[in-house]
């Protein structure tokens, strides 16, 4: 499967670069003019860092549609992406053909329609395969990521498309006569995410499907803590291997097609991302604080403060515990891997601190995993009404 997908990624990129530049030149120039007028990082409606639209990266994506070296053949152009070869740039597979017909304004509209179609489809499946309240938590979680910005930015959209597709594929096959190979599933999701990703917030494509599976395993298989923890670990490793090995494959292809000098350039960037620099030293705790602040919309000297956020969360948790009562400890412990999965964004921030502290105004969306995990965990450990339990057993 790994070799097949790498071949598909490589060939699909090479094929779209066979499209003549003359077919897309006009729409590329008009689209770039629109985004330059808007500015590199416009803030629509909310005027908060949380709602920045990353036109800077979207303009880079459009500029990359046309190779800046005339002597490159389609394979070289598709690997180089204008001397930016460390990523796959999988968005080109859709963006380059569509730009033959459409400009950026039209593609934003089509992208928004596809986003909501996949979003509501995945939410409907969650309601059908789990419980309606889980679907409500899912909708609330995704909506907290400032969708007005997400649906107008191609860089933001691609990871959500992978997430929605992963959830739809998972739940469409869950409970059927042909069970999924879940470790292969997470491996492939990691590969596909890396094909499209710019280190935007890839962890959501692991965290949200994994949380759903951990919840369903307790409900359907009466899974205990060790069983769920081992499953969580294996699934996470599978996703991580798929993500990392797809990146390694791109670097290897780059060396073969363009030369070894590009490999050393990539290694220097990786070193910078992991260790920082004198101008931008790593501040791992500060990175987490920045991303939390952006996500919770905490403003300096504003109405929302850290103390108020924590107080509201504690009061709500206490009220729910008193009102609904907790399940037995064995059941509660089986749900604990969900809480561990909810911590994945913060592990990501600690590892990828340099990137996450610079681009916190969009990497904060990785914390959607924390929100969804927290809500699903609370739902799982609280006692249910007898009518809800009977209905769930009948379903």
Predicted segments with their positions:
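Membrane-interface helix-loop-helix junctions at transmembrane boundaries of multi-pass membrane enzymes
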Residues: 225, 319-343
